[in-house]
Curated annotation (Swiss-Prot):
Record GO cellular component, one term: endosome
Listed PANTHER family: PCD6 INTERACTING PROTEIN-RELATED (PTHR23030), PROGRAMMED CELL DEATH 6-INTERACTING PROTEIN (PTHR23030:SF39)
Protein name stated in the entry: pH-response regulator protein palA/rim20
Gene Ontology process terms (BP): vesicle-mediated transport
A Pfam family it matches: BRO1
Amino acid sequence: MEFLNIPTKNTFHWSCDPLFNELKRLSCFKSFTYENDLKTFKALRSQLCLSHPSINSLSSFQTYHQLLCVLEQKHLSECVAPFVWTLSSSSNERESFENLIFEHACLIYRLACTYHTTAISLCNEKPPNLVQACQYFQLSAGCFRYINDFYIYTKSLDFNENLLKAWEIYCLAEAQTCIFSKANSNDTTSESIIVKILAKVFLLYEDAYKLFKNATGAPSIFVHWTYIQKLFYQTITYQIISRTSYSLNKYGENISYLRLSLLHCKEALKTRFDFGFNVKVYEKLEKLESSLQFELKRNERDNDFIHLQPEIPVGSFPLLDTVTMVQSITPDVLTDKTAAYPYFSTCLDKEFMDLIEEHEKNILDAAVKSIDCLTKEGTEKLFALMEEIKSVNDNRYITETSNKVMENFTEIKNLGGLEFLRSEASSLDCLIDKVNGTYRHCCQALDEIINSVKSSQNMKEKGFYSDVIKLHEEVSLLKVNVENSQNAKDTIQKDISAFGKDIFELSAQSERILSNLAEKKNPNTDQLLLQANSYLAQWDLLKDERNMLKKLGSNDYFNISMYSNHTDIHSLLKCFREAVDAKWNFRRQRERQEIIIQNVEKLKSYLNSFKVQAECSEISKILSFSQETEKKYKFLLQTVRNETEIARELYNIICRAEERYSQYENRYENENRLNKIKLQHSSSNAFNPEIHKIKFKSSKK
């Protein structure tokens, strides 16, 4: 028996800091009991993954497996630093993933390798312990099946479904081989049973070969090895069947199975140089080939001269009966992964904790939003009240209003002022007068040329008349535009005249009222303003308290150790909401805010008795009037510019019509002159007296 060791996977040192921080967040008690479990986790990883474990390390495998299960149950699979492992197909290539499932799959893979290595060692003993080796091969197959059932990690090349299934079938084929060796060494076992066991051996190797061949990341050596093993055991199977046939005097059948056995043996020997396997494998095959050739040659001679029995036609061989005596066995160390293990018991489930923290954040966000709205409301009220109070004590309101009025005047001045507006309007008047004059001249000229052309029948035939009529129609369409420009000019003149009166009146009124208001003095209210500022200080203190509340986290309201006392999330959140309400005390917050606002309102009502309402109302009207005047100025200026653009475009269109008219007029005169010349020439040269001297070219045929 020859076996090939499953390639092992190696790993490297790993940082537990991210996992430690997450466990610290999830711990329910300040006594960090999870630290001991984490130390155990690191120690076992070094023992089982960094070094080479043995079959005596099964208890350590079990503990590490349980620790991983607990961390996965608490949804901490992705809260870890990257795990780095080599690929099974190449020890020089590595893959790295931040996931406990990947680490767990690698651990079970190493457990499978441990069982497999131990099984091969038992087979190589003298005498071999085939029964125990068979069990370990089945346990190794069970490990790969366990990975396939629970720890498929498709991102890794080593843990795709086809490759894991190939390893499982390969281990089962080796286990069935042990049973064959045990049965073959027992003289009491019948050949029919041995054949059935052997048939299952080569079928298992055949299945493993197909899976390895199609699996991504499969080591190429195992593709060749399973193929050779399949052919080797096929050869032996058909050799035993041929001997059974010979013993039953079925000589033709014996020869057919010998040929089939030799065919598979030669097929296996063809791979001699494909891969560097142990020379012993091919030495066995060569000896087997020689034996089969000798036996086939001898039996063919006997059958040809003595027995004369027909051989089995190619393709007519019956299917072989098989017996399966192995199966994948899940090791005891891989107990139920859903069981409750006594590790990290002080840590909450991550998903539960994340859900709680999300709800707590929503509760706190709602509280912050409510207090912000309350603060904003109070700030707006107090700001408005304080602005009114300050306007009573000083002339700031008057000054600000004066500045705003002056800003409006300055804006008008920067745009050119009334003189600039009148200048632009005057330019527009000139342009529109020019448009009217050009339009009338063009229409008059077209009418004259149309009347002149009507008397000339020859010109009508040449299309001149239709061109002039078409141009006349186009020019006539511009009449509406010319009239609109004239109307716009008249309207603008009226608006500018009215605007000049408004701006003069505004200037006189604003100067008079603002100068009168500036001379008035408000009563001394310094003492009352000090009182108002004290209310503002109380408000600032209240806002500082609220800002401190907004900085508090969930642990400041609800000790995390209390989570262990509430299995129901609704009751837990109810307690948290009550704790937040007790600390924020929204009712008390609103009462304190209302008291401050009421005090300021009383102060404002008292100060309003000193305010000169009439003047403030009048100055507001001045400000409004100045703003409207600025808007009207901008509107008039823009209107003048727009009408100027329209008039300029209209003038260009009429000028182009005049150019076309000039072209038609020149064309008309040129055609008349040419016609006169032609008439004179035709009357003077009616007959050519030298016509008999003209020589004509003869046409050549």
